[in-house]
Curated annotation (Swiss-Prot):
The keyword Cell membrane does not apply. Its EC number is 3.1.3.18. This is Phosphoglycolate phosphatase. Signal peptide: none annotated. Keywords: Carbohydrate metabolism, Hydrolase, Magnesium, Metal-binding. GO terms for cellular component: cytosol. The lineage of its organism: Bacteria, Pseudomonadati, Pseudomonadota, Betaproteobacteria, Nitrosomonadales. GO terms for molecular function: metal ion binding; phosphoglycolate phosphatase activity.
Amino acid sequence: MKSFPLPIKAVVIDLDGTLLNTAPDLAHAAELMMAELGRPCPSLETISTYIGNGVSRLVKRVLTGEMDAEPDPALFAQAIASYQKHYGEHVSLHSRPFDGVVEGLQAFKAMGLHMACITNKAEQFTVPLLKGTGLYDYFELILSGDTLPKRKPDPLPLLHACEVFGVAPAELLLIGDSLNDTQAARAAGCPVFCVPYGYNRGRPVTELDLDAVVPSLAEAALMVTKA
């Protein structure tokens, strides 16, 4: 059991569902895609449960209505091209930081902690989204889903961040919202907090192997100290 405040040297934070409420823009792109395909679109609530494994998997879930099913390859090729076009045009139209995010980032910065954003979202969407919502400049390092050969739940992005920052895994805290985050953290040997408001396939984060559930990033900042 971890003791608090937790001594750390770096904090890395997930994007969708942790920093930003991106579901409205992700769902809007899905609606436009499905309209082009002449198909009905799932609800915003349903699409929110599909978020967290990158755009390709999101599109497959929207097409099939299942978490791990594979759609017809020709249909998927048409759908992913449509989705990427529409999402790229509206990546930060309705996406906003969750309550406490900016305050939390400011607190981490004031502590002198290294800060990174680690997401499974492709770089072509990650960077414009962070810039469009005013969060880009908080981070020394941004690792997207296609930056490295592997992404969360693989530990590689976290271990890469440790290497870049010159810290041990136990000194790097991951804050996320899903099973991907907790699995990556445990595999890397990092502590992990989760927020309860994100996109964990519709499941409560209390089911996950984590060190704390934090109501907001502002609350998370109160639970750490610089090592």
